A protein has these predicted regions:
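Carbohydrate-active enzymes and regulators
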Residues: 1-288
């Protein structure tokens, strides 16, 4: 990867900029500063026709991913996880042919000082310095992914279901069987044996889906939405970028999860995208 620092507020990657090699541990930043990273990737045969993701550890408060010049996702630092989501891995494609070539640009923002929004609180002044570590293309292991979320869901259900619930009792029995099947660390055995145990435990978890609520139970349906503040702790130009990061991320989520729906409730914010990020605006219109 290569990197280039700038104070310019740009809508696309700088052309003919003085990029330098991005070395692990490289320091960049300062208040109101941006750092652009760029790299290339060609899909090998072994990764053809499967979902591919980009994992970027470049520092910065928030970053926007461009794939072949089109805004395509957001990255945020772990410290923002509770309030803004910890976006550390973005979808590149749900599957493409071998030898497909991609150009990636990342616009990372160091951030700026905000004195606080509460009358008795004054935020300290940070140095706004960040470190580059890596940009990697990765794949998702579907076996572990499915097992992790099923296990987490049923474990959480034991905490909220009535203590006398027969369903809760069956979940606990199943979790005990899972405990007896899986290896608690990949280091305890070889990869094939570890994954085989996960698959066997998944069969036990899948059985729990046969238990349904009664016809009187309510149905909960979810829809995505993002509260976009206009010029709150930042000037208008940062609102534009926040919208671009957020909306491009929603389009990628829709690509990964076709059933997902997102409500964009501000025509002004859509207008911002039309003016500053027309390729993103085109994708937004297509998704309606």
């Amino acid at each position: 990867a290569q990197m280039h620092e700038t104070e310019q507020n740009l809508d696309s990657a700088p052309v003919d900029a003085a990029y330098i090699p991005a070395k692990k541990g490289a320091v960049w930043g300062g208040e109101w500063k941006y750092c652009w990273f760029q790299t290339e990737y060609t899909v090998p045969e072994e990764y053809a026709n499967i979902p591919l993701f980009l994992k970027a550890d470049v520092g910065g408060q928030e970053s926007m991913l461009f794939i072949d010049g089109v805004p395509s996702g957001i990255f945020t630092i772990p410290q923002n996880g509770a309030a803004h989501g910890y976006h550390y891995c973005d979808l590149i494609t749900m599957g493409t042919a071998a030898n497909t070539h991609y150009h990636f640009d990342l616009e990372a923002y160091a951030w700026h000082y905000t004195p606080g929004s509460q009358p008795m609180v004054t935020n300290p002044m940070p140095d706004f310095l960040h470190h580059y570590n890596s940009i990697e293309v990765c794949v998702k292991n579907p076996v572990i992914n499915q097992f992790y979320f099923d296990l987490k869901t049923f474990d959480q259900m034991t905490e909220v279901l009535d203590a006398n619930s027969f369903v809760r009792a069956e979940i606990i029995k199943t979790l005990m069987r899972v405990h007896e099947i899986v290896y608690y660390s990949p280091d305890d055995t070889d990869k094939e044996t570890f994954l085989a145990a996960i698959k066997e435990a998944q069969k036990e978890l899948t059985k729990l889906y046969q238990y349904k609520n009664t016809s009187l139970a309510p149905v909960a349906k979810l829809v995505g939405h993002s509260h976009m503040d206009t010029a709150w702790h930042w000037p208008i130009d940062q609102t534009i970028k926040k919208c671009a990061r957020t909306f491009s991320n929603q389009l990628k989520l829709m690509e990964e999860y076709p059933e997902y729906r997102f409500i964009q409730s501000s025509s002004y914010h859509s207008y911002m995208m039309k003016v500053h990020y027309p390729s993103l605006y085109k994708g937004m219109k297509k998704a309606i």
